[in-house]
Amino acid sequence: RDFCLSRGLGDVYKRQGTHKAFVNSYDGPTILPMLEQILRRNWPYEPEAMTMASGAGDGLAHTMNAFVQPGDFVITEAPEYPLILDMIEAHGAMAFGVPMDGFGMLPDALDRALTMLESQRLAVPHGGHQVSMILLQPRAQNPTGASFSPQRIDALADVLLAHYPNGVGMPLIVEDDHSGDVANAYATSLAQRLPQHVVHIRSFSKSHGPDLRLAALSGPEDAVEAIIAQRRLGSGWVSRFLQEILYEMLADKEAFHTVTNARHIYATRQKTMHALLLRQSLDVHTGDGLNLWIPVRDEPAALRLLAEQGIRVAAGKPFLPSLRISADATGADAGAGAGVDAHASRGIRVTIAQQGAVNEQVAAALAQAAAVTPKTSTNHS
């Protein structure tokens, strides 16, 4: 995140202190009514219930506490943000990766993954491991920048309804909208088709400041109540003072323009990096948000080459679930991850949040890293 793009939010902090929030109360609502009202204005669907979490990770953790049991499968995108994979492992569950393209998880691959996991469950006496959750990033996916299209939402919903007619037995779908208002794509959700099976989480860390530690969470009433019950075992509720600060920011025109400007700048940096990479004959998907995924032939060699030039990127291996299905029906080994789609193969994550990361020199180095092999790396050195 480029903090220089958020300087205009400081005046909103200075004006804070109108004290609309509930003070010294253990019985107030878990989300301020005035905040919920303003959030619902641009939420991607009309949810039954809403609450607040202390960031997207906190919301994910409480949701997993409520719905994931040890031994369960949790279907994720591949590649997937490593912290999410770590959270799944910490709950004693198993991440199962499904490849994706520029519009998110591939419906055919999800279909095959559900078929495979269900057949394995039925093959075990008394039932084996169940799929309890499907984790998705609806826009500005980390690390690929992919965002759902309306067509992809319909296709994924159709696959799920084919496996779970009328929604009976359907895993909980959890959407992590981690980039929130700095994503250039419109907010969207599978809840537009499957409202009773989706928990949608929107973070405000990248848009309004990480120290707010705030994310809004929506879903069917019973799911939201189960998540609130998990939070009562710890912090109890999210500070209503912080909720009021977020409300003031969302209602403030200057803050709105600051966030909008940041969104446009990040989008411009994505487009600029795409053009610079094309000049280097490297055509990769550059989507939305702060990151892009560069497929590489040899990850260790690529990382060494970039480190020699002082360019920091994230190694791709931690983004890949150890269990994952191929992008096409020819990949029988679910653990190999050997799909035809680049997003499911070896790669590195590049962050374009800072202006200095977007220039000809970086693009040339990334193109070289994408093609490098151990042999060419040795020759280069």
What are these regions (language model features)?
Residues D2-Y13:
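Single conserved hydrophobic/aromatic residue that forms the stacking wall/gate
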Residues G10, Q16-K20, T30-S381:
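PLP-dependent class I/II
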Residues Y26-D27:
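Short phosphate-coordinating micro-motif centered on Lys-Gly-acidic
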